[in-house]
């Protein structure tokens, strides 16, 4: 639509030292483009009669990102189990950005390439097999993403500065058909604005997101370690698991968005819309 000609060169390299075969290093770089889609082409403006109209911006350009990524993986054994520690650091120089704001559940785009910015951070993740064939993991991330709108530096709508997550699964002693899993998340709140306002006019952050889920699953049909094939109707199934979960175990009220109320003095107040509280779930998983 905008008649752009794009070239996206990319390169990556990996290295495993002979003296440390359990360590793998990698580096990647490249120039990436994101072509605009319909909602980003919409350019609102006011005509001579004061009516707001929408036109399509044919001169808009693709958003561009130059990326540098450095990572490493290290495998080892502990407690008689295999583990892998992964780490990654990245920097992304962003240009020709199309700013957008989130109004409750609606995303409103500026319709023009008005800003530039960056995203940088580090990620760490530890994998481990406490249960053979099933990964448990622990992750931690730090990130900063910022853009310049009209000479004012503001966080991007996805600026979640920290995040911690875990997933752990294990069997009960002497009950190999009964499996327990635990999931937890703690992450920073996202930037928020009042309706019809942009972040360069002011913003605030939602509270941190916190959630813990637990689950139990019982194997009604599990693979036979001896390799003996089942007979009858059960021979059609590889495994059947019946499980029960408690989502948001601690009943934490996490904020999803805000509903704005205006009083007679034209002052706006942010009323939080909360996500689902504690919830129970029953599931049946069948593998053929």
Language-model features: locations:
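Transmembrane beta-strands of outer-membrane beta-barrel pores
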Residues: 1, 29-35, 42-45, 74-76, ...
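Signature of Gram-negative outer-membrane beta-barrel scaffolds
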Residues: 1-24, 46
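Residues that define the transmembrane beta-barrel architecture of outer-membrane proteins
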Residues: 5-7, 64-68, 116-120, 158-164, ...
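Residues on the lipid-exposed face of transmembrane beta-strands in outer-membrane beta-barrel proteins
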Residues: 11-15, 70-74, 122-128, 138, ...
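Membrane-embedded beta-barrel scaffold of Gram-negative outer-membrane proteins
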Residues: 16-18, 26, 30, 40, ...
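Short loop/turn motifs that connect adjacent beta-strands in outer-membrane beta-barrel proteins
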Residues: 18-23, 77-83, 133, 173-178, ...
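Gram-negative outer-membrane beta-barrel transporters
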Residues: 90-93, 110-194
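C-terminal beta-signal and adjacent terminal beta-strands/loops
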Residues: 133-136, 185-195, 218-288
């Amino acid at each position: 639509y905008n008649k752009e000609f794009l070239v996206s060169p990319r390169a990556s390299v990996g290295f495993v030292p002979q003296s440390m075969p359990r360590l793998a290093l990698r580096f990647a770089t490249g120039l990436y483009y994101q072509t605009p889609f319909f909602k980003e082409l919409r350019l609102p403006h006011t005509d001579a009669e004061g009516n707001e109209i929408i036109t399509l911006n044919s001169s808009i350009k693709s958003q561009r990102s130059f990326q540098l990524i450095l990572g490493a993986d290290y495998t080892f054994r502990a407690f008689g189990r295999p583990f892998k520690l992964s780490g990654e650091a990245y920097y992304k120089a962003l240009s020709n950005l199309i700013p957008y704001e989130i109004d409750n559940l609606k995303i409103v785009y500026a319709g023009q390439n008005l800003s530039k910015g960056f995203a940088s951070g580090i990620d760490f993740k530890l994998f481990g097999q406490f249960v053979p064939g099933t990964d448990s993991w622990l992750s931690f991330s730090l990130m900063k993403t910022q853009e310049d709108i009209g000479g004012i530096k503001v966080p991007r709508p996805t600026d979640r500065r920290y995040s911690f997550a875990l997933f752990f699964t294990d069997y009960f002693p002497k009950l190999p058909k009964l499996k327990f899993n635990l999931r937890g998340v703690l992450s920073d709140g996202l930037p928020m604005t009042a309706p019809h306002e942009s972040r360069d006019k002011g913003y605030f952050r939602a509270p941190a997101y916190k959630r813990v889920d637990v689950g139990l699953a019982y194997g009604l049909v599990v693979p036979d370690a001896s390799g003996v094939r089942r007979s009858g109707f059960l021979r059609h199934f590889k495994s059947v698991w019946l499980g029960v979960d408690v989502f948001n175990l601690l009943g934490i009220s996490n904020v999803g968005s805000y509903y704005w109320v205006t009083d007679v003095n034209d002052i706006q107040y942010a009323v939080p819309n909360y996500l689902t509280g504690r919830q129970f779930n029953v599931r049946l998983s069948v593998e053929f």
